[in-house]
Structures are given as structure tokens and as C-alpha cells.
Swiss-Prot record:
Topology relative to the membrane: Peripheral membrane protein
GO cellular component term of the entry, any: plasma membrane
Main location as per UniProt: membrane
Protein name, UniProt field: Phosphate import ATP-binding protein PstB 1
Family listed: Belongs to the ABC transporter superfamily. Phosphate importer (TC 3.A.1.7) family.
Length: 272
């Protein structure tokens, strides 16, 4: 049996089935995904609220990371990947052939399981995306670097060593640096694929506190194997199993009164 501290859960919730367009950051409609002959996602539909934290949970291989990577088209990089259905951002299907994928990925940032700083200084890591956009004004870059490092709760730790190599940071610091790099280009949506799985408990707590702060400016979607983490940081939780979205509701409901037997079995540790 897995113990979840219900006192740590968020209490605000939306009617997810009837979420208004103004409150919706992303809408996924009838999404199927295949890798060659193997189907990995089956008819997934959901609305993700703006400026909230939405968690995807489920056993290994259930499709949660695959679904996350659909949101900024990272699966385009996988051979023989075929997608049917729609993901709407501002009412436009991101899989429309007219979509600028590079612009989409600027608007929908992503942070992976293991910290992946570039072999550059701390400063150059943060402003890398801005330089790619042609921004080279020093004052503008300096302001963006400080704003982003503060936003990632790491400014006070690195402000006197901005020109040191990023590889000299601890794992937890590197992950916050990567988050700073992602938010420097001011995306609307931030995708986090198991962002603390490679970190120690103290660094994990720091990242969790940061996630709660990030939602004041960004829509955050997180994949996690850690159900206690999902309960602590998310407002909504989606439970996936074998490529299907089994249940999607406010986090308190998922962890205390799930409506589906599969969800209850997973939450209570009967499988997973």
C-alpha cells in the first residue's frame, strides 16, 4: 500500500470535461500514435488548464512520456512514428503541415530526466536560445539571464560564477539551470519528463518547490513515476495504462476517490 499525504494536495479544481477555451492551454483530441506496427497511444482526449500543474502517471511503458513528447512534436524525431488526431494550441492543430515546428518548441519548452547542460558557461547556457533567435544585445541578454535564473531559483547560488562551466554545478543545480534555459525564451508551456528521477531527495524537494512557483507564469505538464510527487505538485492528474487514458481528474480525486478500478489498483500499489 502506498501512503499519500492528502494534506499536501491542491484543493482548487476545474470541471475538466467542460473547461472553457479561455482556461484551456492545450486540448488533445482523439490522439493515436504508432511506432511502425506497434500502437503506443489509443484515442487520448483531454484538456489541460492554463497555469496549472498537470501530472501524467502510470506504470513503465504506459505511454505517459510518449504523450508528453507529442505536445512539442519531439516524436517527429523518431523513425516510423505516425500520429492521428489533434493537439490544439490557441485553437490550432500543432500537427498542421503549416506549423513552424521550431517556433512551436520555443513556445512549448521541455526538460528531460537527466540534466543536460551544454559544455558552456552558466551564462551562455541560459542565453543560448535567445542567441539562436538573433538576440545579441548585452543588456537584454543580461536581464534575461538574471530573470531566468531567479525564476529557476538558482540565481543566488550562481550570480558570482556566471562564467564558470556549467558542468561544475551539482546535479540539482544543473537541472535548475536547464529549467532556466527553457524559460529564458518565455514559453507558454513547460514539459517536464521525470525531472527529478536522477536527483537526490534534497534536490528533488527544491525542484518540486520550483514547479509550484513556475505555474504562476507557465502551464506545467510533468511525467513522474513518483505518486507522492504527483500528489504534492500537481493540480490535475492523468492516469495512463497500456497507452490509454484511464482517468483524468483533479489530483485530490485521483488519489482519494478514483472512479476507475484500474486507477485505484495502481494508486494502492496492487500493480505498477
Amino acid at each position: 500500500m502506498i501512503s499519500i499525504d492528502s494534506t499536501a494536495m491542491k484543493t482548487n479544481s476545474f470541471d475538466l470535461a467542460n473547461l472553457s477555451q479561455d482556461d484551456t492551454a492545450l486540448e488533445i483530441r482523439n490522439l493515436d500514435l504508432r511506432y511502425g506496427d506497434k500502437q503506443a497511444l489509443f484515442n487520448v482526449s483531454m484538456k489541460i488548464p492554463k497555469k496549472q500543474v498537470t501530472a501524467f502517471i502510470g506504470p513503465s511503458g504506459c505511454g505517459k512520456s510518449t504523450l508528453l513528447r507529442c505536445i512539442n512534436r519531439m516524436n517527429d524525431l523518431v523513425d516510423n512514428c505516425h500520429i492521428d488526431g489533434e493537439i490544439l494550441l490557441h485553437g490550432q492543430n500543432i500537427y498542421d503541415k503549416r506549423i513552424d515546428v521550431a517556433a512551436l518548441r520555443r513556445n512549448v519548452g521541455m526538460v528531460f530526466q537527466r540534466p543536460n547542460p551544454f559544455p558552456k558557461s552558466i551564462y551562455e547556457n541560459v542565453v543560448y536560445g535567445l542567441r539562436l533567435q538573433g538576440i545579441n544585445n548585452r543588456r537584454e541578454l543580461d536581464e534575461a539571464a538574471e530573470r531566468s535564473l531567479r525564476g529557476a531559483a538558482i540565481w543566488d547560488e550562481v550570480k558570482d560564477r556566471l562564467h564558470d562551466n556549467a558542468f561544475g554545478l551539482s546535479g540539482g543545480q544543473q537541472q535548475r539551470l536547464v529549467i532556466a534555459r527553457a524559460i529564458a525564451i518565455e514559453p507558454e508551456v513547460l514539459l517536464l519528463d521525470e525531472p527529478t528521477s536522477a536527483l537526490d531527495p534534497i534536490s528533488t524537494l527544491t525542484i518540486e518547490e520550483l514547479i509550484t512557483e513556475l505555474k504562476t507564469k507557465y502551464t506545467v505538464v510533468i511525467v513522474t513515476h513518483n505518486m507522492q510527487q504527483a500528489a504534492r505538485v500537481s493540480d490535475q492528474t492523468a492516469f495512463m495504462y497500456m497507452g490509454e487514458l484511464v482517468e483524468y481528474a483533479d489530483t485530490n480525486t485521483i488519489f482519494t476517490t478514483p472512479k476507475k478500478r484500474k486507477t485505484e489498483d495502481y494508486i494502492t500499489g496492487r500493480y505498477g
